[in-house]
């Protein structure tokens, strides 16, 4: 059995979980999330805990067992605390500006790039070089952060571009000068 899958999930006070077959709805102070889970797993409530159990022992069932437990745990954490991902802009003249709910990136192109967040995601700009992506759905927050990073990935010669906060970018050495024929 999956080590992650067999751990029960504690439901904190103030969080309401509705289980209807394989459809689960989680309501909390930050919002509501719903998800349909695979038929290979069953989700049951036992007191203040949620327990995910596999239906069979084949490989497909085992592969969805731990995944389902983690997705359910992320739903509970999301409606209780939310998720956020921080991005940094590195480079001379590169910046981000807030324009209503949109963010305008000026990252070395001849044009500016405007990013509008989808429903449930908020973008905030701290200064001109830090962007924060927040929301209750961990998958959507990560996807939005990845899309913003893909606007201008950090280059490996100067390190300029948009990167995750704390991300290490390996800088390659430039061309060697003075080596070769005389």
Swiss-Prot record:
Q: Which GO terms describe its cellular component?
A: cytosolic large ribosomal subunit
Q: Which UniProt keywords apply?
A: Ribonucleoprotein, Ribosomal protein, RNA-binding, rRNA-binding
Q: Which SUPFAM superfamilies match?
A: Ribosomal protein L6 (SSF56053)
Which Pfam family, any one of them, does this sequence belong to? Ribosomal_L6
Respond yes or no to whether keyword Ribonucleoprotein is given for this record. yes
* InterPro entries in the cross-refs: Ribosomal_uL6-like (IPR000702), Ribosomal_uL6-like_a/b-dom_sf (IPR036789), Ribosomal_uL6_a/b-dom (IPR020040), Ribosomal_uL6_bac-type (IPR019906)
Instruction: Provide the GO MF annotations for this entry.
Output: rRNA binding; structural constituent of ribosome
Among the GO biological process terms of this entry, one is: cytoplasmic translation
Write out the function statement from the record.
Answer: This protein binds to the 23S rRNA, and is important in its secondary structure. It is located near the subunit interface in the base of the L7/L12 stalk, and near the tRNA binding site of the peptidyltransferase center.
- What binding partners and quaternary form does the record give? Part of the 50S ribosomal subunit.
* Family according to the record: Belongs to the universal ribosomal protein uL6 family.
Under which name does UniProt file this protein? Large ribosomal subunit protein uL6
The top of its lineage is: Bacteria, Bacillati, Chloroflexota, Dehalococcoidia, Dehalococcoidales
- Per the record, the gene is rplF
């Amino acid at each position: 059995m999956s080590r992650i899958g067999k751990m029960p999930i504690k439901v904190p006070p103030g969080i309401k979980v509705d289980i209807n077959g394989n459809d689960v709805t989680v309501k909390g102070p930050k919002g509501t999330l719903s998800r349909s889970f695979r038929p290979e797993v069953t989700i049951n409530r036992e007191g203040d805990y949620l327990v995910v159990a596999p239906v069979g022992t084949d490989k497909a069932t085992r592969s969805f067992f731990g995944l389902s437990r983690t997705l359910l745990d992320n739903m509970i954490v999301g409606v209780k605390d939310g998720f956020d991902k921080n991005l940094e802009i590195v480079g001379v003249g590169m910046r981000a500006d807030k324009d209503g709910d949109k963010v305008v990136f000026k990252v070395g192109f001849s044009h500016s790039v405007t990013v509008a967040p989808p429903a449930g995601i908020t973008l905030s700009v701290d200064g001109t070089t830090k962007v924060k992506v927040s929301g209750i759905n961990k998958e959507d927050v990560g996807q939005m952060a990845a899309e913003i990073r893909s606007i201008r990935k950090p280059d490996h010669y100067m390190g300029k571009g948009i990167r995750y906060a704390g991300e290490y970018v390996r800088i390659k050495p430039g061309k060697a000068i003075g080596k070769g024929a005389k």
